[in-house]
């Protein structure tokens, strides 16, 4: 499963050149950010108010599926505040010393962005509490009878935490965020505009019909839309004239096994596994993960949300179950109705 082409993981597999292109496509201001209208409206007000008062913005939690703009919004927050930004992630902060070094390097009102904040180790999270509330941390030196604590005072700062699994955050950590915002999947119209903007930045000709086609297969996710645009551009340059029109876009997307719903080989394999091996479900997440050779957290965090949103998969108290739409989409005969105790 991990060897299949998976456009959702392109951000992590890309080389330095690809990451440079991705950064080039990021909006730098609230005005240039498309979609998430209510989130952007509220954030822009909070940021403007903090700037007027000369204070650090309240700690902010951004949560929602991957690729919707959490990292981009953290960059915009720092840009709009006119302060510095430091970026890290939960798994990287192994020890309290890692956190202390990062926090002590922040200047007044700077922004610290922690991606995957739900993956912070408990001991690091404990140290973060006093930093968020009182702008100080207490570090223990030595062990045993000679152990002593030193207090490090910090400059006021804003912590922007991002997570795809807000339910895994502990209650004490969640309570320390003054701003809590959820990002939703984008509609096709908004994604089309993002594709057209990215095409202009990349200096590639892209027709409106082609942009609509790419947007329709992007799973409502800007990161995927931009990744698909770059791959379609490759096909246009090698197999076409260099310009992206609807025929070359369709050709490229079919070659990448991205269907009209935006499902790829990984999605098809997941749904087919539940149908073929488990009679359509219900089946437990860990059982599915074992059958696919994949991590349960990856399935739950990366693959499932869109399949559930689009009606291909549902969660029940007894496990995951595919829907009639999944049978139809895969060209399978829907299973017979199973009578319940109340039929």
Swiss-Prot record:
Listed GO biological process terms: DNA recombination; DNA repair
Where is it localised? Cytoplasm
The UniProt catalytic activity note for this protein reads: ATP + H2O = ADP + phosphate + H(+)
Q: Which GO terms describe its cellular component?
A: cytoplasm; Holliday junction resolvase complex
Q: Which UniProt keywords apply?
A: ATP-binding, Cytoplasm, DNA damage, DNA recombination, DNA repair, DNA-binding, Hydrolase, Nucleotide-binding
Q: Which domain of life is it from?
A: Bacteria
Cite the binding residues for Mg(2+): 71
Spans annotated as Small ATPAse domain (RuvB-S): 187-257
Q: Which residues form a coiled coil?
A: none
Region (Large ATPase domain (RuvB-L)) location: 1-186
* InterPro entries the record matches: AAA+_ATPase, AAA_lid_4, DNA_helicase_Holl-junc_RuvB, P-loop_NTPase, RuvB-like_N, RuvB_C, WH-like_DNA-bd_sf, WH_DNA-bd_sf
UniProt cross-references to Pfam families, sorted A to Z: AAA_lid_4, RuvB_C, RuvB_N
User: Can you tell me which residues bind ATP?
Assistant: 25-26, 67, 70-72, 133-135, 176, 186, 223
Residue span of region Head domain (RuvB-H) = 260-343
What does the sequence similarity comment in the record state about its family?
Belongs to the RuvB family.
Q: Please describe the quaternary structure of this protein.
A: Homohexamer. Forms an RuvA(8)-RuvB(12)-Holliday junction (HJ) complex. HJ DNA is sandwiched between 2 RuvA tetramers; dsDNA enters through RuvA and exits via RuvB. An RuvB hexamer assembles on each DNA strand where it exits the tetramer. Each RuvB hexamer is contacted by two RuvA subunits (via domain III) on 2 adjacent RuvB subunits; this complex drives branch migration. In the full resolvosome a probable DNA-RuvA(4)-RuvB(12)-RuvC(2) complex forms which resolves the HJ.
Q: What does this protein do?
A: The RuvA-RuvB-RuvC complex processes Holliday junction (HJ) DNA during genetic recombination and DNA repair, while the RuvA-RuvB complex plays an important role in the rescue of blocked DNA replication forks via replication fork reversal (RFR). RuvA specifically binds to HJ cruciform DNA, conferring on it an open structure. The RuvB hexamer acts as an ATP-dependent pump, pulling dsDNA into and through the RuvAB complex. RuvB forms 2 homohexamers on either side of HJ DNA bound by 1 or 2 RuvA tetramers; 4 subunits per hexamer contact DNA at a time.
Q: What is known of its domains?
A: Has 3 domains, the large (RuvB-L) and small ATPase (RuvB-S) domains and the C-terminal head (RuvB-H) domain. The head domain binds DNA, while the ATPase domains jointly bind ATP, ADP or are empty depending on the state of the subunit in the translocation cycle. During a single DNA translocation step the structure of each domain remains the same, but their relative positions change.
Record protein name field: Holliday junction branch migration complex subunit RuvB
State the encoding gene. Answer: ruvB
